[in-house]
């Protein structure tokens, strides 16, 4: 959600002008009324939806196993893949890396997206074709992109680094002091529960898996 708000308000661009002693107020598009398209609606997708709806965004999603109850719970709407790509002002990728999601976002999918839309990849690096995304940014097909994950990490040679409209972060989308503490506690809890023979599904990413 931080990436959505970053692009919606263009704070960085305004900050740079102020540091150059340039006073130039601008009207930015904002988030209200914009369509946030979630590709994948697991735990991360749901958490994003919970934060986007209060900003009065129109949240749509696509996944392999839609659940009508989720639509009521999170205030979102299921659409097919084609509609998701066509209507999203922001497209957030929240899927695991599998054979079917490798280069999920390639030139063909990018061509289907709304011109000027914004791509956000917080899934896994190979889910996007970096070179196709780079071309889409340079041509203006994509308005911007936020990428937190890369095909190989550490990554210091991404072609996206040459695109001023790409915001790149070193796989830190979930890296906060609070999250780190919670993950450490969860790890300790799992070890203690396992030793006591009481390990449950509380911290499982895929419920029911062992």
Functional labels for PLM-detected ranges:
Residues 1-35, 47-50, 202:
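Phosphate-binding beta-alpha-beta segment of Rossmann-like dinucleotide-binding domains, i.e.
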Residues 28-32, 53, 111-112, 160:
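Short, flexible hinge/linker loops that cap or flank conserved catalytic cores
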Residues 49, 57-58:
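Residues at the starts of beta-strands that form the adenosine-phosphate
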Residues 65-159:
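Rossmann-like adenosine-cofactor binding region
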Residues 116, 122-210:
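Rossmann-like dinucleotide-binding domain for NAD(H)/NADP(H)
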């Amino acid at each position: 959600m931080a990436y959505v708000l970053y692009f919606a308000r263009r704070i960085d661009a305004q900050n740079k002008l102020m540091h150059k002693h340039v006073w130039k107020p601008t009207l930015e598009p904002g988030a209200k009324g914009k369509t946030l398209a979630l590709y994948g609606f697991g735990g991360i997708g749901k958490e994003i939806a919970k934060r986007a709806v209060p900003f009065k965004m129109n949240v749509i999603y696509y996944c392999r196993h839609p659940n009508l109850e989720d639509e009521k719970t999170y205030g979102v709407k299921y659409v097919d893949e084609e509609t998701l790509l066509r209507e999203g002002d922001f497209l957030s990728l929240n899927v695991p890396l599998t054979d079917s999601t490798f280069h999920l976002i390639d030139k063909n999918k990018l061509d289907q997206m709304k011109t000027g839309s914004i791509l956000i990849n917080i899934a896994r690096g190979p889910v996007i074709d970096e070179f196709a995304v780079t071309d889409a940014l340079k041509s203006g097909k994509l308005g911007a992109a936020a990428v937190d994950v890369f095909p190989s990490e550490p990554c210091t040679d991404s072609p996206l680094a040459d695109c001023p409209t790409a915001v790149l972060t070193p796989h830190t989308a979930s890296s906060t002091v609070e999250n780190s503490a919670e993950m450490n506690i969860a790890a300790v809890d799992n070890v203690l529960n396992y030793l006591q023979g009481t390990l449950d599904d509380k911290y499982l990413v895929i419920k029911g898996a062992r």
